[in-house]
């Protein structure tokens, strides 16, 4: 057998045997395995033959990848400048501009090298993170069930498939109940197909119902999915981030093009300038105006941010999900496990018994029999844990068949034989589902609902238990009449940090809505305990097939937008809630864990698979949590906003620099016919690139509200700040070249109306002035308040100091004839630093003015909150948090907007007294709104004239 085995497996490898269609016994024979699975040694040997169970990744050439960083619109402009330097500049009696050509190529290589190294590091980090999300499979090895990476599966392995699993390899099903399999990803079939014992299932399809064991028949590239993947290449969609990047790049390129056209028209036909100096001036605009490092800075910032998120317990599967997370303003959160601990307890004293001759202990035993003893969920563990010995759940009986939980039936069931050989069946699950089974439903329905409501008022979930005899003795038979025997109360305590996290979320402008499958009263009680509000609706009344007539005339979208949560939610309702919130222009996040949550997770702007989610939910999500609880999501929101803030800061900076270089040097060239050496612009660009890379690790204050790309804000701020810097350079040039101001005030050597040779010193002075103030601009764009108040990252400061020290040394000492500059000495260097410092201060005021003009709120930062004029730490933080909370509750219709209460008050003392009373009333109202059931609902009632309490009471599930 040992000699024959490799040959047989070789036949399987070459697909000479049709394992998909031959009888199942022959499958075992051909794969040389049994239903007891493989040994670890045999599996290792087969791994060497068949390879890993994953698709071959196309390895890109590292050289081509490196050169790829030089192939984008921004690099094309630089490459055009390099060609200009040796082709077009070769005239006017002068040789080609080799130093500029070499400088441009050096800049491109430096930029590509940084991009290559950073992206390689980010790629390695991303690969390590994605490895944590690698699909797992339950496999029988050495006679024991183990959880292994799906990548190590081999033909002949016995695997277990259950609800929510993505099937890890092509397999044939063994004995058991039929499965419902969703093959839409492979075949396009919209409805799940039923697969029974002996049928084949494909890798990549999803188990929608049932549980069964299967034998693996093909892995990796030999699977149906693997062969299909070889035929088609995945298409890369252009994401929103890429569109923004393109828009900013195009703006910079167009600005340069406009500047060059104006220069060409004025210099040659009007001023009749010499050919070669004109080309040099055009090169200055081309080289200095292009933000060559922009793609690198932004992608590296996102990659580093993604790694930071992973450390916090949120793994991003799609990089651009970070920008969506930063803009998220509504989060629909599961209750169980996210807002609560998902650690259930049962109070035996509260158990209600509905059958004669049955006591509370018997109800617990029957519920335990309808539970798993292995691979338990939270409910199974809580119920089996109530027994003195967990083995009692199967003591004295023989298990015939177990029906696992699924979202449709919402119950589990066990068919078993007792010691006398009689067959029985016991089921536990959602009370409504169990009640529907009962033969005497009409007799007990009122009492059952009364008990459920009594439990719900105390925040307790209910679990129904029913029992039947199966006289036919077959597991397939319907059995005798079901007897409803009892209701168990389940308590799932809220997480200790949930209430505080919800308060933080509201202060950050994120409205948290509870989405729960539990009944309305439980949702309201949990909402009350967490301080998130009790303005909740039964989702079936709003979104179900049979919407209630009394609220059908009401604006459903508006009710959904203003609701604090939804109860009795089915997976299809989640999808509808997300869709309607998006229609109201909200950036919506949705948490989920089950296979049926996948459509809602895909539809949401940010699909969040919670800790312990099924493979299907993880596959559909954008972010996968590795820790439980809402606090992970809110931390991820803050981190995402910080990442987004860094990217936004850089884009404003990049646009500003383009405008300042193009406008500043164009005016110098056209007004005073000053030819700035292109090589020195290259030096500025190289030093800038080195410094600006550190922005990806800068210390920033996240936006206090959801943020998104606002191109109008970026371009307006960039144009105004860039225009200001350009004018400062023009004024400096005029003062140094046309007046005696600096020599008179500071005692430095004069540059006034100097000879042409001394343009070299003027070039050095302009170089230093442009270099310092251009790079210092990053400190203005990175801060929301005064730039000298918000402490920047250590790396950014060090990089700035080193770069400007180098720039100062070049300006002071360099006598480079090839670059047409001459050292200006320490006196002029000091003058330039002072000049830049004086004209740096108005940059913050201009920033506030732009923000005020765009939003009308910027002066709040300076005057109302006074954060710029105090040395106190966190001055006014509490008041600001309350203001944000107030603004958000007003936005979502949860309190009446501000009105001018004191318009008629004329007496100053009276006004003060009124103000104090109003403050006290406002604080009482705020606390009441946060902590009482009535406070949350009354504003909606007032605004809409709706009797919301009546609506809610009429639809208690």
Curated annotation (Swiss-Prot):
Pfam families: Cation_ATPase_N, E1-E2_ATPase, Hydrolase
Binding site for Mg(2+): 593, 597
Residue ranges, Extracellular side: 87-98, 270-279, 671-675, 736-760, 815-823
UniProt keyword annotations, A-Z: ATP-binding, Cell membrane, Hydrogen ion transport, Ion transport, Magnesium, Membrane, Metal-binding, Nucleotide-binding, Phosphoprotein, Translocase, Transmembrane, Transmembrane helix, Transport
Stretches in topological domain Cytoplasmic: 1-66, 120-248, 302-648, 699-714, 782-793, 845-957
Lineage: Eukaryota, Viridiplantae, Streptophyta, Embryophyta, Tracheophyta
Family according to the record: Belongs to the cation transport ATPase (P-type) (TC 3.A.3) family. Type IIIA subfamily.
Catalyzed reactions per annotation: ATP + H2O + H(+)(in) = ADP + phosphate + 2 H(+)(out)
Listed GO CC annotations: plasma membrane
Membrane topology category: Multi-pass membrane protein
Biological source species: Nicotiana plumbaginifolia
Tagged with keyword Acetylation: no
GO biological process, one term: proton export across plasma membrane
Function: The plasma membrane ATPase of plants and fungi is a hydrogen ion pump. The proton gradient it generates drives the active transport of nutrients by H(+)-symport. The resulting external acidification and/or internal alkinization may mediate growth responses.
Protein name: Plasma membrane ATPase 1
GO molecular function: ATP binding; ATP hydrolysis activity; metal ion binding; P-type proton-exporting transporter activity
Catalytic residues as annotated in Swiss-Prot or TrEMBL: 334 (4-aspartylphosphate intermediate)
Matches recorded under SUPFAM superfamilies: Calcium ATPase, transduction domain A (SSF81653), Calcium ATPase, transmembrane domain M (SSF81665), HAD-like (SSF56784)
